[in-house]
Amino acid sequence: MQTIAPLWLWATFGVIVLASLFIDFVVLRKQGSQDIGVKEALNWSLVWIALSFLFNGLFWWAIKDTTGSTELANTKSLEFLTGYLIEKSLAVDNIFVFLLIFTYFAVPSHFQKRVLMIGIIGAIVLRTVMILVGGWLLAEFHWILYLFGAFLVLTGLKMWWAAGKEPNLDDNPALKLLRKLIPVSKDYDGENFWTMENGKKVATPLFMVICLIALTDVIFAVDSIPAIFAITNDPFIVLTSNVFAILGLRAMYFLLASVASKFHLLNYGLAVILIFIGTKMCLIDVYKIPVHFSLGVV
């Protein structure tokens, strides 16, 4: 796997992510059981977006300083921005699935914050592994791009056909399997994932929520990661754009949860994006669609 990013930029990225997670954890502890209002969620969302743009500025400077090419720095910076916006767009659909899960299990809002925090950490670890493996596969087997492209087109078509239909968690095969394998209590026991019931250790509904959130992220990662590989093969750009989009997921959830009903055309828009990106991947050896055009579509 080849990357244009210097080693010190990788290290800087790691420090920023760890510091961001620490700050988010401190804020979570300070808030306690207090609900997050729309204004606070908006402020934090703007903070995470600003941090992403600042990092992109640092990335642009690092490439220009390393290569001496302003044109190359502009191109790579644009690739980061496009990947970031793709991930942000797909994260909106992810958030609405989270909302569906929280509503189904009647999860109190102050419990939701902890679940989302765990979900963000899990998503960063999972996506780091998937991106590094995906980058290696693409470097060794170029034809995998065509598989990714076809998969995204099919996913986009499926999303278009399913748009407007209300999902039913009662019919979810993963939830049915979990309930068969793991005994679950009827009530919550604070923020505990396990509790004692009739002398036996059983899972709480919060544990089921964590499992479904993790499964949801796996499913969405399979969509979003190939989509960004359509923009660039550089694992650094794919990873950083993904992670910076994920860091603001908790604030973004509380910002959008209150206006979820207004996004009734969202899935149609996301379907178009996935179909376009999948087509771009399938045509990559025939015609290379410019990055700025991809950014415009997103």
Model regions and ranges:
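Multi-pass alpha-helical transmembrane bundle typical of ion/small-solute transporters
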Residues: 1-298
